[in-house]
Amino acid sequence: MTPVEEIDNVVHSVFPDWQVYFYAIPEEVINNKNVTQVLITESNSDVTGYGGNTFNEMAFGYRLQVFYGLDEENLIGKEITLYKALEAKEWRITDSQPRYLDISQTDGQQMIKNIEINKTLTLDELNQ
């Protein structure tokens, strides 16, 4: 399982109705403000954990940009639930930016949250 697939599984395990996308939100759904959408993009990928003249681990970083549906409530509670689920799979929350309104929209402004997570995986864990 790739790291982004694992993140997708974690998000859907706690919020099955949220839509999760990798690297881009498709045009046909990008304006749907009634559902919470999560955009996952890679922020870091590095080799680490050297031994035997080669690397044995890779460190991954991902940015989760959460576009909350207009009717979504208790955002702090949802974020805590997501953080705990990610931590249970050994993802470390390294940055959690303040929520902000998408002021580029005039007909309904979504709340947006940016979260950075990191995890180091051995090559065996990556099935290499």
Regions found by a protein language model. Give the residues of each.
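Acidic-leaning, charged glycine-interspersed low-complexity segments
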Residues: 79-128
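Small/polar-rich, solvent-exposed N-terminal microdomains that initiate assembly or binding
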Residues: 1-50
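Intrinsically disordered, low-complexity coil segments
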Residues: 26-33, 72-77, 104-105
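Amphipathic alpha-helical segments
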Residues: 4-16, 78-91
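Oligomerization/assembly interface segments of phage tail-like spikes and tubes
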Residues: 56-70, 109-121
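Short, cysteine-centered beta-strand-loop-beta hairpins and adjacent loop/turn segments enriched
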Residues: 47-48, 70-74, 123-127
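Mid-chain, well-packed structural core segment of small domains
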Residues: 58-88
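Short, solvent-exposed beta-strand/turn "edge" segments of beta-rich domains on protein surfaces
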Residues: 50-56, 106
